[in-house]
């Protein structure tokens, strides 16, 4: 049995992702070896191993919106394997997520929840994917270049190659590096600066990504996303 089939059998990824990730099956196996090696040397990483591939736990064919992040929050107990999401118990919320919620309220006239677990979106067709899937605690971007980028780029390329609509929401420079693999008549791209407190005032606020994504889905003949979190 191949490596990806084993991951699917264990519930680490959804079975529908096996074919899409086949070109990087050996890369994924190598990343597993790399992380085990780091741990054997006493180096920790986030998120918890069971959540590293969580973004791939939802059906490949169900993805209608892709939201790309940079890498997991580097704070212990925060990241849960989905871009911008944090564990339900985390307080205060990270600045980027607070800004996402500010724009969410402004764009949709909906009240965001008090918690930061936005995994409900994943169940409704929104893939929350980081470019880099692990990080060293306390050191942002510390696993950039370790090998995750080719894996996540392959996943995004596979999504774009389907014959179904996809709206890609690219916040910030690292996410926008994926534009070249998202060129398709069935893909629409929404981009702005990152929601980080350092950049949100330079174009994230007022960008209306949620309502624009739904408008584009309708234009492409697909059902809109139910963005409600409460």
From Swiss-Prot:
Q: What is its EC number?
A: 3.2.2.27
- The superkingdom listed in its UniProt entry is Bacteria
Fetch the SMART domains from UniProt: UDG, UreE_C
Q: Which InterPro entries match?
A: UDG_fam1 (IPR002043), Ura-DNA_Glyclase_AS (IPR018085), Uracil-DNA_glycosylase-like (IPR005122), Uracil-DNA_glycosylase-like_sf (IPR036895)
**Top-level class of the enzyme under EC nomenclature:** hydrolase
Location(s) in or outside the cell: Cytoplasm
Q: Which CDD domains match?
A: UDG-F1-like
> What positions constitute the catalytic site?
71 (proton acceptor)
CC terms in the record's Gene Ontology section: cytoplasm
Under Gene3D superfamilies, the record lists: Uracil-DNA glycosylase-like domain (3.40.470.10)
User: Does the keyword DNA repair belong to this entry?
Assistant: yes
What catalytic reaction does the record list?
Answer: Hydrolyzes single-stranded DNA or mismatched double-stranded DNA and polynucleotides, releasing free uracil
Q: What is its main location?
A: cytoplasm
Q: Which SUPFAM superfamilies match?
A: Uracil-DNA glycosylase-like
GO MF terms here are: uracil DNA N-glycosylase activity
Q: Which GO terms describe its biological process?
A: base-excision repair, AP site formation via deaminated base removal
Enumerate the PROSITE patterns for this protein.
U_DNA_GLYCOSYLASE
Keywords in UniProt for this one? Cytoplasm, DNA damage, DNA repair, Hydrolase
Under the heading HAMAP family, the entry gives: UDG (MF_00148)
| Similarity annotation | Belongs to the uracil-DNA glycosylase (UDG) superfamily. UNG family.
Describe the function of this protein.
Excises uracil residues from the DNA which can arise as a result of misincorporation of dUMP residues by DNA polymerase or due to deamination of cytosine.
Q: What is this protein called?
A: Uracil-DNA glycosylase
